[in-house]
Swiss-Prot record:
It comes from the Eukaryota. It holds the Pfam family Defensin. This is Defensin-like protein 47. It comes from Arabidopsis thaliana. The keyword Amino-acid biosynthesis does not apply.
Length: 83
């Protein structure tokens, strides 16, 4: 009887552990409204991200600054200046 309880408890713990980490991410082709990919030039990296991108776009005369973005999942992430 004791081994049956242990076996059932282990089985339930395994089922619970397997069901918890549900990290499925569904990608969609939804566009961010008001975000333009027309002026994307510099490739973003660990050292060059949103702060640097925004500053460079403001210096270049883009009123809304800029942000790193990509129009598709396999596409490279670039600094996109916004008008």
């Amino acid at each position: 009887m004791g081994s049956t309880k242990t076996l059932v408890t282990c089985f339930l713990v395994i089922i619970l552990a397997v069901s918890l980490p549900n990290n499925n991410v569904l990608a969609s082709d939804a566009r961010i409204e008001g975000f333009s990919f027309d002026n994307c030039n510099i490739r973003c990296s660990e050292d060059y991200w949103n702060d640097e991108c925004n500053k460079d776009c403001l210096r270049a005369g883009f009123q809304k600054g800029g942000q790193c973005g990509s129009p598709c999942i396999p596409c490279p992430v670039k600094c996109c200046c916004q008008k």
